[in-house]
């Protein structure tokens, strides 16, 4: 009977919680702002963790790159903080990536809304022409 979650998934969940707390409490750089950790992917050998983040209230590409760079420079420090929370032999190396899925989701949602509105207007036009 297979397990519902493998070890790398459990470590990823624990790292996500620990990193969220560590970034909020330990990172004092105002350029980073409010960070939302969307996902953490840990390799099967538990050596590397990819952390996907977004920044609340930041839309500027340059500011996003700066914030990701700051987080990557602090990755060693954050790894040390996380290692104190986790009870595993070695803590995965951390690398931060900007998560573009939220932005893509908003674009797709607006496209769908626009298509629905156009479809409704075409159906109303067709209904109006049939009555005449």
Curated annotation (Swiss-Prot):
Superkingdom in the source lineage: Bacteria
GO MF annotation terms: ribosomal small subunit binding
Alphabetical list of Gene3D superfamilies matching this protein: 3.30.300.20
InterPro entries referenced in this protein's UniProt entry, alphabetically: KH_dom-like_a/b, RbfA, RbfA_dom_sf, Ribosome-bd_factorA_CS
Any matching Pfam family: RBFA
PROSITE patterns, per database record: RBFA
Claim: Transport is one of the keywords in the record: no
Keywords (A to Z) from UniProt: Cytoplasm, Ribosome biogenesis
GO cellular component, one term: cytosol
Single biological process term from Gene Ontology: maturation of SSU-rRNA
Subcellular location as annotated: Cytoplasm
Role played: One of several proteins that assist in the late maturation steps of the functional core of the 30S ribosomal subunit. Associates with free 30S ribosomal subunits (but not with 30S subunits that are part of 70S ribosomes or polysomes). Required for efficient processing of 16S rRNA. May interact with the 5'-terminal helix region of 16S rRNA.
NCBIfam families, alphabetized: rbfA
Family in the record: Belongs to the RbfA family.
Stored PANTHER family: RIBOSOME-BINDING FACTOR A, CHLOROPLASTIC-RELATED
Subunit-level organization: Monomer. Binds 30S ribosomal subunits, but not 50S ribosomal subunits or 70S ribosomes.
Entry protein name: Ribosome-binding factor A
Gene, per the UniProt record: rbfA
